[in-house]
Amino acid sequence: MKYLPFLLFLLLNAGTATAQNNLVINGIPWFDDKGNIVNAHGACIVEENGRYYLFGEWKSDKSNAFPGFSCYSSDDLVNWKFENIVLKVQPDGILGPNRVGERVKVMKCPKTGEYIMLMHADDMGYKDPYIGLATCKTIAGDYQLQGPLLYKGQPVKRWDMGTFQDADGKGYLLIHHGPVYRLSDDYRSIEAEVAHIKGMGESPAMFKKNGVYFMLTSNLTSWEKNDNFYFTAPQIEGPWTKQGLFCPEGKLTYNSQTTFVFPLKCGNDTIPMFMGDRWSYPHQASAATYVWMPLQVEGTKISIPEYWQAWDINELKPVNPLSGSLQIEKKQIYADSCWHITKDKMESDAK
């Protein structure tokens, strides 16, 4: 690990000249309103009343043990305000000391108005997995852990997971290697297994576009990146068809792993925004970063044909992050990679 001086651009300094800051800049640390690194991995986004809420894993550089789930908010998906550690380490149980908490996902239940949080809980050896359930009356408040999510009265003992909320208000739990479960009307338990997608991997993420359901997933390479792939279906129940990669082969999903697909409003349309993690185990708090980019959709085909180091979230086009930027004082951060300028482009050797 290197301790590097990192020259921050004003574009990255949340809370400073925010009116000029509409760029998503991939693969480098983001900073919140307090000047701290945005620490929200394996994340999801919930939009409410014109504001976006980012939930993720509050990582540590010292241990993979669960330190809590974080929440940030923003009105533009670029400048983030720290809200709360919305679920803290529990005194005991599935998210007690020396346990793992990952893949946090939050949905608002349309029937009850309650915020439902699901997550993967485990022991440090990943041999005691559970899908956990927590609830809260307010979106960024203190969530209460209710225990394992139950299906037919039994805990769901699986690990990598995601969620999907359909336009009809039904909620779904997505599980590694293929199971898709429909949640009960109050989202507090599982009602039925509605599909099993053969050939799936880990980190499932689902979205719907033009009547087609898409399921993104990664291969199994632990913390290492790989070429993620996807499936499609005319309905959640299937039949599901494997379509292949959505990034160029060998690009390793631009050194990231799928975590979520957010429906980004663009005029009268909605653009699916890929959200991926660049893991940097064991230095996840200081060196792990994010890759967010719009997915191109044509029928049953999706793609991210090229990597955008930075892009304008309003115009959905790539931008040179050095163009017109103003440099500010240096800050010290931990990093496992170096940044350099080549032919007026900012590039990283991040793994």
Predicted regions and their residues:
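Bacterial Sec-dependent N-terminal signal peptides
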Residues: M1-N21
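Carbohydrate-active catalytic/glycan-binding domains of CAZyme proteins
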Residues: A19-K345
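Short beta-strands within extracellular/lumenal beta-sheet-rich domains
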Residues: E347-K351
